[in-house]
Amino acid sequence: LKQDATLFSPEVIVREVDTVRLMVLDGQGGGIGATLIKGLRASLGLDLEILALGTNSIATSRMMKAGANRGGSGENAIVRTSHGVDVIIGPVSILMANAMMGELTPKMATAVSSSPATKILIPLTQERVRIVGISREPLPHLVNLAVTMVEEIVLEMDKHV
């Protein structure tokens, strides 16, 4: 067992070392997060621990129905969880304060961006941001690429999935 101390809490979380913990973060309706979770489950199976974090309960509920192990909603859940996971996956807007029509707070964006977790970002956003060097791909193609990246990260981490 390994102890992980979070930056935002004096509590210590005890978990098994050999399990990769993924945090899927989404807001609004949770559709991108749900699609990611379905893709991860189809490719990597049930042994993977997927935490669904939503900026609201609707997004979290939709991701839970897609196959997440556990879920949490709102700023505090996102801030606390982001420092206890190995990988964070979501749309690029999870790094932008006030994104998702204001649902993603500055504290959420700071927690995600400062987390030691590897971040896999889907280049979809409704914000007025354009990313150079990114071609427009449909969501299913982007999900496949993200799942492949998670598979590579799991192999690099040499953890059980």
Which residue stretches match the model-derived regions?
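Glycine-rich phosphate/diphosphate-binding loop of Rossmann-like nucleotide-binding domains
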Residues: 15, 20-55
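Short, ordered loop/turn segments at secondary-structure junctions
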Residues: 27-30, 55-58, 76, 93-94, ...
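A short helix->loop->beta-strand "cap" motif at the edges of active sites that frequently abuts
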Residues: 46-48, 114-119
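Glycine-rich phosphate-binding loop
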Residues: 70-108
